[in-house]
């Protein structure tokens, strides 16, 4: 029992160098412990910890120590699955120690908890990837980790006002780390709606001075996740504000670091389509360190279709990229938002030609219908159409008035429709922006960023 006594003595005095589930770091010590603890049942190990002379008088701390000895005694180094109960039991006991603000050696336990969290999330993800073979539920292990971390999150009160990080408990210094881990897990287990409670209880605007003291990479990650949450809820402007702030902050970090470059790519995967919905045109030059030429070329094709009002081109692009758009939960929001921006650009082109070159301010519905036919291409209404899809089932040249009225209601077109006369009348002017305002200007006026977003 020499090794077990030595381990408990280390733990009792706040030395947690051997307290890890990662056998690549403490495999030798675990092998010795396993040999020494063979023959001890759970009750004997519990008594052994309880009677150790140096052990602090803290129930949760003792339970954690006992759990680690159980793990050392029974772990199978060749099978994470067969040892999973032991692994997750110890991790839960470790996190439970931190729930108590007066836990022994809490300042030293905090970095242990973050280190083991990285290990356990990686392990849980691997086990979940084999859920069919293991006959477990989809995302079972990551969901369990999220429930453990959420209890720790709920035990930490976010700082308020201008409190300095030197005057707050250590747990609050890992609060943003916990927030990001939980939100990342919720996205991974396909339950992003669970992020709502996290964002509701952690609002940087009410603790701005303290928020800015967190590590910059954690601030960037928080904004990225908040942007994704807003985008899933169709709050496009709010989402873009967060993606843009995250990306601008990331540019302050050394781009020689590959992890930073990868994070930049993650942000741009959402910032680019969000900006397109808002009518923003991308300057690709500054983005080249983060995007491959193939990716730039692919997005450029979509930008071109939207800019020139090509509904058929937009639908084809979405269909061709359906798989990766679904993986990023972008398909629905693009299907919902992009067509009206594309229609707006199409009608703008018609008005420019009709009013500038011909001096007319009355657009016949028949003219617009013909333009829509060219833009939309074959539809499900055509005799030769084979199927109705999410791409062709909504667009029809017959929807002239519907398109015009929707654009007018959205503030993207200043005009009057006269159904009986089959005319759309616009202002007589060569200043096209007076008839077709910029998309970004209109959206930001109609859907301004929430006050709690601007921080």
From Swiss-Prot:
Q: Name one GO biological process term.
A: mRNA export from nucleus
Query: Where located?
Result: Nucleus envelope
Q: Which domain of life is it from?
A: Eukaryota
Per UniProt, residues of the PCI domain are: 220-431
Identify a single GO molecular function assigned to this protein. double-stranded DNA binding
Other noteworthy facts:
Present with 1140 molecules/cell in log phase SD medium.
Supply the name of the protein.
Nuclear mRNA export protein THP1
Which species expresses this protein natively? Saccharomyces cerevisiae (strain ATCC 204508 / S288c) (Baker's yeast)
